[in-house]
Design a protein with these regions (language model features):
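Short glycine-/aliphatic-rich beta-strand segments at the starts of folded cytosolic domains
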Residues: 13-27
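Short, surface-exposed ligand-recognition loops at beta-strand->loop->(often short) alpha-helix junctions
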Residues: 24-35, 70-71, 106
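Short amphipathic alpha-helix segments
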Residues: 29-49, 80
Length: 301
């Protein structure tokens, strides 16, 4: 998501061409694109991709620019500062080659975790997964197969237990800090996060819901869909918020089904959709293609 100030990223040696990603959002008015591209021209930037959107609902303007330049990060920041001030922009600047450090949380169902770990290894997702966290031990062998550390953080329903939800979330916060995490992915993690943790992770936590939201929220959505005789099932990747399954949607996919298929068939087909949908959302987020527009998102896919 875009940030109020330019986000930190390493500065390359002066003179070396380096790829950067710039995102911005502000109230729409004339002259924004001209001002931004002019500032980039001042640091010898060669723009390789540029996308923009003017929201008719909020009146905000959104822009994402990829460019290469020999300028240092400090030079770019200095060139953009007057533009940011003039238009009151929320702006982010990143190293395009830097992989996003991602903590994956899971429970017992490993298909989405496996997809993320495989794509990380294959180089098709611009993320680095330094740790997998789970409230169960079932998926430890899967993480070990990919050489990724697995940390068991059990969650007890007893608030007085050493494994209480409060204690588990405190442990999660420690791990986020320890591993310098930029993104948290709930890959079928079957625990509801506290409102406080959801607020703290706003814009940096993605969940996959095994339903085409806003239909069939909560548990066993495929069985709900089967009972209603739907002809399409799907999956929704969204940002985590305190309102369960109500966060801004990043990506959705659907799969056709028929009356002849059982609820178990729905589940099997749905798993494939979940994996691809979550991976797409993670990819877009890690490439800084997702910006908040009220309760919605702008996705420069």
């Amino acid at each position: 998501m875009d940030t109020a100030a330019l986000s930190p990223s390493p500065s390359p040696a002066s003179g070396a061409e380096h790829a950067r990603v710039l995102t911005l959002a502000c109230t729409n008015r004339k002259g924004i694109v001209h001002a931004v591209t002019g500032a980039l021209l001042g640091v010898e930037a060669d723009i390789t991709e540029s996308q923009q959107y003017d929201s008719p609902d909020t009146g905000d303007f959104f822009m994402r620019v990829e460019f290469v330049t020999p300028a240092t990060r400090e030079d770019i920041d200095q060139a953009l500062a007057p533009v940011r001030e003039e238009f009151g922009m929320r702006m982010g600047l990143w190293d395009a080659a830097q992989r996003m450090r991602t903590l994956v949380m899971c429970s017992k169902d490993g298909h989405t975790l496996n997809d993320l770990l495989f794509q990380q290894r294959a180089g098709t997702l611009p993320i680095e997964i330094p740790v997998v966290v789970s409230n169960h031990l079932d998926l430890q062998p899967l993480a070990s197969f990919y050489g990724v550390p697995f940390i068991h953080v059990p969650v007890s329903k007893d608030p007085s237990s050493r494994d209480s939800k409060e204690a588990a979330e405190a442990r999660l916060r420690d791990l986020i800090a320890q591993f310098d995490i930029e993104l948290v992915v709930l890959a079928r993690y079957m625990q509801i996060l506290s409102d406080e943790l959801c607020r703290d992770l706003a814009g940096m936590a993605i969940n996959i819901h095994h339903s085409f939201l806003p239909s069939f929220k909560g548990a066993r959505p495929y069985h709900q869909a089967h009972e209603r005789g739907v002809k399409l099932i799907g999956a929704t990747a969204h940002y985590v918020t305190a309102d369960l399954d109500e966060g801004p949607i990043i990506a959705q996919s659907v799969q056709p089904v028929t009356h002849a298929q059982t609820a178990a068939d729905f589940v099997a087909r749905g798993r494939d959709v979940e994996g691809s949908t979550l991976a797409q959302a993670v990819r877009w987020h890690a490439q800084h293609r997702v910006l908040a527009d009220g309760r919605r998102t702008v996705v420069f896919s």
